[in-house]
Structure formats: C-alpha cells, structure tokens
C-alpha cells in the first residue's frame, strides 16, 4: 500500500467514525425526546407534590428530558440537576428499576446515576456540572448561554411552578442579586449569568468546554458511559 493511499484510507475511516458518532447521538437524542415514561410515574410525583396538576407533571417531564439531553450532548460527562421538582421526577423514575435501566442503556449506552439538585457554591464538581447543564439546555432552546435574555425550561421550572423549596432563577443578574423572590417561597434568586463567572470557585469549568462540540466522543467505553460510573454520585 502506498503512503498516499494509506493517508486517504485513514482520513476516510476517521470521517466515517465521526459521521457514525453523530448519527448515533441523533438517534439517542430522538429516543430521549420520544420516550414514553412508565405508567403511574406522574401519580407518584403528585404524591410528593400534591399541588401539581397533570399539565404541570407533563412540563416537569419535558424539563427532565432537557436534563437527559444535556447529559447526552456533553459526551456523557457529569451534569448537575438545577431543579428540585425535576429531580423529584428523576428519583421516582429510577424506582422503576427495569424501565430506567433500559432507558439509560438506549439513551446513553450506560447507567446514569442520580445526584441531588444543587446550586452554585464552593463545591467545584457540582458547579462544573451545573455550568455544563446550563450550556447545553441553553443551546437546546437557542439561548445565548453567555448573555441570556430568558431561561431554559429546566432552570425556570421551579419558579414557574412555585415550588416552595425550589431553586428560582432569573436570566438578568444585573437587576436582581439574590434578593427575595417576592413569591410564596421566600427563597433566594439565582442568576443565569453567574454560570460564566469565576467568583464561586475560581474557575468556569464546564462552561462551553470541549464536550459542547457536536462531534463524537460518545463511545460506550471512552465516553464514561459504558458502565456504572456515569453522571453524579449516588443518593
């Protein structure tokens, strides 16, 4: 085999691998978007949150899909959950053990472990996961993650549904800086613009990192999604 032919075959192989990875990611994303949640899941959520209507539960399920898509699009890197009520639905979904295991294998190629909902703090791993989640949910809704004019659903959800213990966000940090929300929750307000700031832990890891590329990196072995170590820590 001549050297030019070898280089040509190498380039062709690399191109085919990239195309195959993109196709697989697209198939997995469509699977997440169209997946039918197990029967009875909303009823279990409403036992935790009796104030939720069926329409509210459907909105929560849409937000949870955003979280799963963020994990997929990150290359199956660690992502943190920003919503208390979406976290509740995620936790209830996990209790459907067989359904959740099959979902994870089909959507990610491996199991996604649960990690509790968090906000920006001094905990660097959680912050990295939140920034990564923010980046990909913004891109999902065509929002500029560096200068947002509105919030992606996953970050707006707790305030929208008036979740008493929820994490309430605003897009514009210049007008509100962790004041009382003025609603029934009486909680703090968190700012979308803070995800590009290094003031919390001295860095911006996870914000628009290399995982945000739409290329490959989703191999079941090399992506970190091939076994039991995907996502965050256990409960």
Regions found by a protein language model. Name each.
Residues 1-9:
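Feature marks short, highly hydrophobic, charge-poor N-terminal signal-anchor/signal peptide-like helices
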Residues 8-18:
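Alpha-helical membrane-embedded segments
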Residues 16-40, 44:
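Transmembrane-cytosolic junction motif
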Residues 29, 33, 48-52, 56, ...:
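Conserved aromatic-histidine-acidic binding/catalytic patches
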Residues 34, 59, 235:
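Polar-ligand-bearing catalytic/cofactor-coordination segments
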Residues 42-78:
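Acidic, Ser/Thr-rich low-complexity segments on the non-lumenal side of membrane proteins
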Residues 77, 81-160:
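Short, structured secondary-structure elements
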Residues 149-235:
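Short hydrophobic helical membrane-anchoring segments positioned at the boundary
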